[in-house]
């Protein structure tokens, strides 16, 4: 085969072939399949189909099939020469959480059930949580980002002081952090990684919801490396199941924490959470399971049974309850989703 004769090499039927100037397919491998036999009054059309690896899916308006035209261009009927992309699958853990896997002490052991869970370590070795929402971005709380920093710290000051792990203690490098413009009332920040993380059984983003899953009574799952009953950070990822609580009851429980002029807060944990239209509460279960210091930044993960997909309904903001208070407080993802999408697109 001359250099002028072969203009493109392609993979057909699992084997390498070449297309010459006459649009004829020639087998250029040593042990390849023979080319298809000819038929009367017909011809062989050369086409390829793009497919994605495990844990990725094809994103295209076409069907992924491209045909070689007379001008030696690979064309899809719907999108022309625009190539498809492989995007990460979200919210489809290989080993989803099983509510029967209860262990004594209230927390539940997680074995790959929450591949979106990241572990963030701030200055002075304080552990907090973060949630992977695509291959390169994570959500966490603004309070987590400001740990051991003054209120005057900037995002550029904060980013180099953080250490982040995904999957099975896989260290990833942080490029930047972005704080919500109203982070004093909307306790949220974004983390951008320097490189996209490969998605696999242990590392997978959770999906962002298209509707509000924070309905009273709905059960969600919260994972994390927060402190245990002995007030020590756990070495193993744990999770709990918690129901969404009535917001009015939650506000009454914290006794006026939304009214700044009250001088004597009466929170059962001595700290007042942010409670407003951007938050919801989840109640402690009858097994006295709860979130605790270090769990903030983790997702309130809801399993949509119809879609068999896991969504982040909220991000844990107030993790100080530790089975003392009845409610943890979460930032609604639907309240911040526009900001998240615009920030990611801008950066």
From Swiss-Prot:
Any coiled-coil regions, as ranges: none
Keyword Isomerase in record: no
Which residue ranges does the record annotate as region Interaction with CD163? 259-264
An annotated GO cellular component: blood microparticle
**PROSITE patterns per the UniProt record, alphabetical:** SUSHI, TRYPSIN_DOM
Any one GO BP annotation for this protein: immune system process
UniProt entry keywords in alphabetical sequence: Acute phase, Antibiotic, Antimicrobial, Antioxidant, Disulfide bond, Glycoprotein, Hemoglobin-binding, Immunity, Secreted, Serine protease homolog, Signal, Sushi
Q: What InterPro entries does this protein map onto?
A: Haptoglobin, Peptidase_S1_PA, Peptidase_S1_PA_chymotrypsin, Peptidase_S1A, Sushi/SCR/CCP_sf, Sushi_SCR_CCP_dom, Trypsin_dom
Q: Where is the signal peptide?
A: 1-18
The segment(s) forming the Peptidase S1 domain are 103-347
Where the record annotates domain Sushi, the positions are 31-88
Family, according to the entry, reads as follows: Belongs to the peptidase S1 family.
Domain note for this entry? Answer: The beta chain mediates most of the interactions with both subunits of hemoglobin, while the alpha chain forms the homodimeric interface.
Tell me what this protein is called.
Answer: Haptoglobin
The scientific name of the source species is Pongo abelii
Name of the gene this protein is made from: HP
């Amino acid at each position: 085969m001359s250099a002028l004769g072969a203009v493109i090499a392609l993979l057909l039927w699992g084997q390498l072939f070449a297309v010459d100037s006459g649009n004829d397919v020639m087998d250029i491998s040593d042990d390849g399949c023979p080319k298809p036999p000819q038929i009367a009054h017909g011809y062989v059309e050369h086409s390829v189909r793009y497919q994605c690896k495990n844990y990725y899916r094809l994103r295209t308006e076409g069907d992924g099939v491209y045909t070689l035209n007379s001008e030696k261009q690979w064309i899809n009927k719907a999108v022309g020469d625009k190539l498809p992309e492989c995007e990460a699958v979200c919210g489809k853990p290989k080993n989803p959480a099983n509510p029967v896997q209860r262990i004594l002490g209230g927390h539940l052991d997680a074995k790959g059930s929450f591949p979106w869970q990241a572990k963030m370590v701030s200055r002075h070795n304080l552990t907090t949580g973060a949630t992977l929402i695509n291959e390169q971005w994570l959500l966490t709380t603004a309070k987590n980002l400001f740990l051991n920093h003054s209120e005057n710290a900037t995002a550029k000051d904060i980013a180099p002081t953080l250490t982040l792990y995904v999957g099975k203690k896989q260290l990833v490098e942080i490029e930047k952090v972005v704080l919500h413009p109203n982070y004093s009332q909307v306790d949220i920040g974004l983390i951008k990684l320097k490189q996209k993380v490969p998605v696999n059984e242990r590392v997978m983003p959770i999906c962002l919801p298209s509707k509000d899953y924070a309905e009273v009574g709905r059960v969600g799952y919260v994972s994390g490396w927060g402190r245990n009953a002995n007030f020590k950070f756990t070495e193993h990822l744990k999770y709990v199941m918690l129901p969404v609580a009535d917001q009015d009851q939650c506000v009454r429980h914290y006794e006026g924490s939304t009214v700044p002029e009250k001088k004597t807060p009466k929170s059962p944990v001595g700290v007042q959470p942010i409670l407003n239209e951007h938050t919801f509460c989840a109640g402690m279960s009858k097994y006295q399971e709860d979130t605790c210091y270090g769990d903030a930044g983790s997702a309130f993960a809801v399993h949509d049974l119809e879609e068999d997909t896991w969504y982040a309904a909220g991000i844990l903001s107030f993790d100080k309850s530790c089975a003392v208070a009845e409610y943890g407080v979460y930032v609604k993802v639907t309240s911040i989703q526009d900001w998240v999408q615009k920030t990611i697109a801008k950066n």
